[in-house]
Each structure stands twice: as structure tokens, then as C-alpha cells.
């Protein structure tokens, strides 16, 4: 409770009430001003599972957090459920992450499977759906708004700008009744950013994030220098493998070998051989170039064009992780505005001094991309597992109880062993006395 009061006050405004009571009752979570109830409870023997531990911590944070949303920032939860449950769940996530490292929050990557499946399902609804019409309350009012606001904080605005804007919203509207547009306008006004595209996609639309690398094109500068270009083309041609028919036809006798008089100039001619005409043409070209154009021809580097496709329809920033042949990496971040003229597909040029071996979209899993397999170029091999399983009676997952039982068993075994050794020592016959 104290942790919640401290963190929520930091992100919004100081807690204005004299007390905050949390009751661990055998009932579902429910909040009222200054008091709330929540479960789960430990077992009768005092043990509890990992799920019980973190479930209770999370629900305490959540229910105590409702003192801010909607008790003080008094939005209409009967109309716009996400304005209290979603904003509160978002602050709950921030508070959980400062409880301990790698806290298992709902929007951690390993727990997002259900949400990602919902985001790409045909039955999804916009966040801006009236509360009475929602069919997936958990996703629409709690988890999706949490995910959206975290992306806005981490990948769009940045923490400093977002935290300032969110605090301004909370302070401007404490003890008042804001609507969704009040929230949207305040966030834009306080951050100084036009976020219409973000609200439209995440809150009014049902599109999802699925950005695919469709292709990567590798370009090299055509210097027009025959000593470079023709030799490079010849090396590339010579490196090509023979077709199957060429390989099978090699041992066959050829008529021109039997009758050499059939050969002419073109039997020995190679269009990639350097000629005097090539040399003269190149010299003429160089003389007609400006110093800037000459410098461009001499530039050493690799030119790549990455074709990206927005399969999910949701406009998002693009994060590219580029891996080079020497194993070094570079991260390129492109703002969402890159989709402004062509929201369905774009191409991005990368100029590098080294050869690229791999490109990955969303390497930090920050944009909720529903299909990460098309994020790689070249594509990675998918790994799966299979095994043998037998049905068994389900048992509760309570490692703490299992540990205590194992310790109790070991203690009893040690006592039994000690008891047997004592009995054995007692029953030993005394050695006969020497005469």
C-alpha cells in the first residue's frame, strides 16, 4: 500500500486523504474511497503459490490506485471504462516495475500471448466503445490501454515528455470529470506533440501492429570505370554455378571442335573484356563531371533499400536493428510520420560502410507486433518442440508448500536414521573381557 501511494503520487499528485486501507478478504477486488478489498489469500497452512503472491501484490496496487482514478480524477466509468481501469492499470504497471526487477506484469512479453491474439482477431472492438457494449472488458478496458500508453511513453514521446504530460492531465482534472477528449487534448497540449494519428489508431480503430520486411535490395555504385565494373561483373559471372544441362553436356563432342573453321570472332569474344573504347569513354566521362560528382563516384560504401509493409494497418514508429558482417550492430529509429504519404508500404535506404548480414524490425518488442517471424531478413528458421505426455491428476502449483514438505520429509528421515543408529549402538553386545 505504501509503495502504491509513493509511486502514484510521483506520477500524478500527492495522495490527499488521511488513510488508505487494504483488506485481504476472500472476495474479488473492489475499491471505495480510502478502502478496498481484494484476494487471493494464502493457504490455511500459511503457504502460497507464486501466482498468489504476485496476484495479490498486483491487485493491492490496482485497488489502492483507484483512489486516483476514478475517485479523484472523476471520469465516468459507466461510459468510458478505460478512463479509470485503463489509466489505473497503466500506473499499476509502472508501480509493479519498481517493486522488483522483472516483475511479471500483464504486458510483459512472455504474458502477452492472449492480448496479441485478441488484437489480431476479427472480433476485436475499439477502446472507445461504450462500457455497456464491450464484449472483452479485460482486453479493451484494462490491458490494451495499458499497452498503448506504455508504447506512447517509451517509443513515441519518451519518458520525460510523457510523464510531464500525464502529470499535467492528472493535476488539471483532479476533483473534476474529464472526458476522453479532455485526456487526448491535455496530453497533446502538455507534450507539444500532434498525437491524432496515435489516438485514431489505438483508441478509435481496431488495426494492429504487424510490420513485415518484404525485401532488402543491395546496391553498389556503378562507377563506369571499366577496370572496376567489368572485372567485378566478370567475377560475379564466373562464380555462378553451371546449370544441370550444362554440366551434363560438357562431355558431349562439339561440332566446332571437330571443324575449327566454323569458329569466328564471337567464339573468343567476351563483352566483359576491357577495350580501348571503354577506356576512352571513361576518360571522356570523368572530364565532364564536377568535383562533387567525381567524389560521389569514388565513394566507397554499401547501399541498401529495405522494403517494409504495414500488414496490420496500425501506423507505428519503426525500429530497425542492423547487423554487419563483423558482428557489430546499429539501431535505426524511424518516427511514425514515415508512413504519412504511404501508410501501406515504405522503403528505407541505408548507407553503410560495411556489408549487412541481417536486419530485424522491433528488436526490443516495444510495438506489440503480433507476428515477429516476418520481422527478420533473411527469415529465421522456426523452432518447435514435441514430446510424450501422459494425463495426470492436476495438482496445485505451490512451490513454497512443496519446499516445506520436502524439508519436513528430510527432517523426519534424519530423525529416523539417528534413532536407528542409537538403537543399533544400544543393542551391541559388549566385547568379552580378556583373562
Regions found by a protein language model. Give the residues of each.
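Hydrophobic alpha-helical and helix-loop surface patches within well-folded domains
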Residues: 1-287, 295
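Beta/coil-rich, acidic/histidine-enriched accessory regions frequently appended to metallopeptidases
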Residues: 171-418, 426-428, 432-435
Amino acid at each position: 500500500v505504501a509503495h502504491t501511494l509513493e509511486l502514484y503520487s510521483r506520477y500524478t499528485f500527492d495522495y490527499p486523504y488521511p488513510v488508505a486501507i487494504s483488506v485481504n478478504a476472500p472476495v474479488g477486488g473492489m475499491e471505495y474511497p480510502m478502502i478496498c478489498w481484494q484476494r487471493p489469500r494464502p493457504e490455511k497452512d500459511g503457504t502460497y503459490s507464486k501466482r498468489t503472491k504476485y496476484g495479490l501484490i498486483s491487485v493491492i496496487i490496482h485497488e489502492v490506485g483507484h483512489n486516483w482514478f476514478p475517485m479523484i480524477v472523476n471520469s465516468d466509468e459507466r461510459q468510458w471504462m478505460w478512463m479509470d481501469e485503463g489509466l489505473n492499470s497503466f500506473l499499476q504497471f509502472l508501480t509493479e516495475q519498481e517493486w522488483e526487477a522483472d516483475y511479471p506484469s500483464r504486458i510483459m512479453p512472455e504474458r502477452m500471448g492472449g492480448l496479441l491474439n485478441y488484437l489480431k482477431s476479427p472480433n476485436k472492438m475499439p477502446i472507445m466503445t461504450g462500457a455497456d457494449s464491450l464484449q472483452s472488458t479485460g482486453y479493451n478496458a484494462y490491458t490494451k490501454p495499458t499497452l498503448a500508453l506504455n508504447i506512447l511513453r517509451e517509443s513515441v514521446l519518451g519518458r520525460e515528455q510523457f510523464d510531464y504530460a500525464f502529470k499535467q492531465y492528472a493535476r488539471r482534472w483532479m476533483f473534476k470529470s474529464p472526458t476522453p477528449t479532455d485526456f487526448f487534448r491535455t496530453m497533446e497540449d502538455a507534450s507539444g506533440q500532434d498525437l491524432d494519428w496515435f489516438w485514431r489508431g489505438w483508441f478509435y480503430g481496431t488495426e494492429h501492429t504487424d510490420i513485415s520486411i518484404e525485401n532488402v535490395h543491395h546496391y553498389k555504385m556503378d562507377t563506369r570505370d571499366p577496370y572496376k565494373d567489368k572485372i567485378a561483373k566478370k567475377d560475379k559471372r564466373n562464380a555462378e554455378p553451371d546449370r544441370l544441362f550444362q554440366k551434363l553436356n560438357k562431355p558431349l563432342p562439339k561440332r566446332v571442335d571437330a571443324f575449327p573453321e566454323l569458329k569466328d570472332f564471337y567464339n573468343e569474344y567476351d563483352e566483359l573484356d576491357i577495350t580501348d573504347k571503354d577506356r576512352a569513354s571513361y576518360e571522356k566521362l570523368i572530364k565532364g563531371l564536377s568535383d562533387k560528382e567525381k567524389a560521389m563516384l569514388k565513394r566507397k560504401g554499401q547501399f541498401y533499400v529495405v522494403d517494409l509493409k504495414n500488414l496490420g494497418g496500425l501506423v507505428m514508429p519503426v525500429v530497425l536493428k542492423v547487423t554487419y558482417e563483423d558482428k557489430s550492430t546499429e539501431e535505426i529509429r524511424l518516427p511514425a510520420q514515415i508512413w504519412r504519404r504511404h501508410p501501406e508500404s515504405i522503403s528505407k535506404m541505408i548507407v553503410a560502410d560495411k556489408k549487412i548480414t541481417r536486419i530485424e524490425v522491433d528488436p526490443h518488442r516495444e510495438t506489440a507486433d503480433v507476428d515477429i517471424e516476418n520481422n527478420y531478413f533473411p527469415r529465421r528458421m522456426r523452432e518447435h518442440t514435441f514430446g510424450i505426455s501422459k494425463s495426470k491428476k492436476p495438482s496445485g502449483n505451490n512451490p513454497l508448500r512443496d519446499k516445506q514438505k520436502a524439508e519436513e520429509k528430510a527432517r523426519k528421515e534424519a530423525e529416523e536414521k539417528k534413532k536407528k543408529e542409537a538403537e543399533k549402538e544400544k543393542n551391541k553386545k559388549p566385547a568379552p573381557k580378556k583373562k
